[in-house]
């Protein structure tokens, strides 16, 4: 509530638990454990599907999807980029973890850096591409909160609610354009792979990535 700048949470959120033999479950990709219909205040969850990245427990999944509804309410229904919405939902659902650091570091090592403006389709393609998108979106929001403090999120959402575009709101609150912020973000994370040698063993490479991520 405080993170999003909401004084009133609004109407109760309906949580639908859909069994695997339901039509709604059959129509959703098998790797999706839940989704939100934010404008209607509804979350649809598939309890028979073991939550996987970015959520490792059912409780985290619930918080993640409810987070989408709350972000929608914080902006008064005005749109924010998918990556920001997903990054916030991840931030609301659980703390940042070693696995998240490792995934972002792997994106740097493997040359899979994706511009935030190009991240949208990655959430829909495959489980692997969605996990990649969640990690990058979560990392950027985590970085924003670390640099600007948690009140920055509420200020950005409040400005969007008041009629500002998301880029203008972000600039007004942080003093940086999204392009500048993204460039700085990647610059701060580049050191994580500068000392990784070229190795033939992928297992060894992952061990190095994990060790470096511990110090992030």
Language-model features, listed with the residues they occupy:
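Juxtacatalytic substrate-recognition/specificity segment
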Residues: 1-80, 133
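Post-HExxH zinc-binding segment in Zn-dependent metallohydrolases
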Residues: 2, 6, 77-121, 172-189
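Secretory-pathway/luminal and periplasmic proteins that interact with or process carbohydrate-rich
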Residues: 21-27, 96-101, 163-168
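Second-shell loop/turn segments in exported
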Residues: 45-57, 73-79, 89-90, 124-130, ...
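Soluble non-cytosolic domains of exported or imported proteins
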Residues: 52-61, 79, 83, 128-135, ...
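Active-site recognition of the HExxH zinc-binding catalytic motif
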Residues: 60-73, 86-90, 141, 149
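Long, well-structured alpha-helical subdomains associated
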Residues: 101-144, 148, 153-156
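Beta/coil-rich, acidic/histidine-enriched accessory regions frequently appended to metallopeptidases
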Residues: 113-117, 125-132, 158-216
